[in-house]
Amino acid sequence: MSLATLETRLDHRFGNAALLEQALTHRSHSARHNERLEFLGDSVLNFVVAAMLFERFPKLDEGDLSRLRANLVKQASLADIGQRLELSQYLRLGEGELKSGGFRRPSILADAVEAIFGAAFLDGGFDTARKVIVRQYQPVLASVDPKTLGKDAKTLLQEFLQGRKLALPLYTVVATHGAAHSQQFEVECAIPALEIKVVAPGASRRAAEQSAAKLALEAAQAASPARAVRKQGKARKAAQLSLPVAVAQEVK
């Protein structure tokens, strides 16, 4: 498959296309794989993301900046970038990895993303690698909230519900798919008090729970204003109903 579309998404045309091919090559495919490029890309990525955070959040201290960076460069965040780049269709995997669904495995996607950053550094130097990384991370940073740094979706949902004195969510595995070594899980997250039930998939039970919690949190945040309006309406109605009784008591 042509790499031209991927290069457009990266906003970099490789002078040495072999570097990009190597970045997409898993060790199960050939001896010239991407692990050394991944090592290099990891170092460049950490520096560039640290600089981006330093500029964007001038009031955050070192501890908060470190936690935020760790959250942005972790495997799940890199795998999300890999999915957005549609790397699955470009990965070069051995037969065993192909059969086991390695092209969608978060660890393989994340490693390939870091390897691409390393390849960009070797192909065009630091400025090129920085441009490639910034392009991928700008939309991520635009939605970053320092108040939630380092907290996963389940923790955020729990804090949201506890802050409103609501019962904690219930997580249930509703389905599993695939062979034992490459199972996909579907988990339901239910919040009875808000009449919310959502289902999300994941490569592990934990990943599916996190995805379901994220959907449930979004639904709960959307439902909260409407719930508050309903409560105000009920309180107003109760006050109106009690008014004639109060008047009657005064007349007596």
Curated annotation (Swiss-Prot):
Domain DRBM residue range list: 152-222
Catalyzed chemical reaction(s): Endonucleolytic cleavage to 5'-phosphomonoester
Location relative to the cell: Cytoplasm
Cofactor: Mg(2+)
A GO-annotated cellular component: cytoplasm
The entry's keywords: Cytoplasm, Endonuclease, Hydrolase, Magnesium, Metal-binding, mRNA processing, Nuclease, RNA-binding, rRNA processing, rRNA-binding, tRNA processing
PROSITE patterns documented for this protein: DS_RBD (PS50137), RNASE_3_1 (PS00517), RNASE_3_2 (PS50142)
Domain of life: Bacteria
Record CDD domains: DSRM_RNAse_III_family (cd10845), RIBOc (cd00593)
Pfam families (alphabetical): dsrm, Ribonucleas_3_3
Protein name: Ribonuclease 3
Organism: Bordetella petrii (strain ATCC BAA-461 / DSM 12804 / CCUG 43448)
